[in-house]
Amino acid sequence: MITCSMITNIILTSQQHNCLVSLAKDSLPNESCALLVGNHNGKETFVLDLIPMKNSDASIISFSIAPQELIDAYQTVEKQGMEVVGIFHSHPAQPLPSSVDKKFMQINPVVWIIYSTITNEAKAYIFEEKIEEVQLRVTTA
């Protein structure tokens, strides 16, 4: 397993990016969330599939995923021979990790993509000893 400190890029297709933006906008005024499924190749993380998840908080300022829904998703991903490489969620503010995000980033050491429904900008982050920005690349393929 690759550690977060080795990851410098996360790569999405434009179609995947558009799906995440649509998920965020369709979930308004609440935050949205999804799991990013894929694999790693050296310092790059490739997203191959998206699993939209229900925000069980149904909140405009937070998200959570029901434990059983999360377990089911991880089992499905594992059966496909892939792994959860990231977590996506939207913010009603700047695309920056909140203090709550920081806490959960420590527990879930994957890339976190945060999309701002205000600025329509997405940024990616990892947490090791501190939060670091990861380059988010959107490809046309």
What residue spans do the PLM features occupy?
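Conserved beta-strand-loop surface patch within small alpha/beta domains used
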Residues: 2-84, 92-141
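Conserved, mostly hydrophobic/aromatic
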Residues: 87
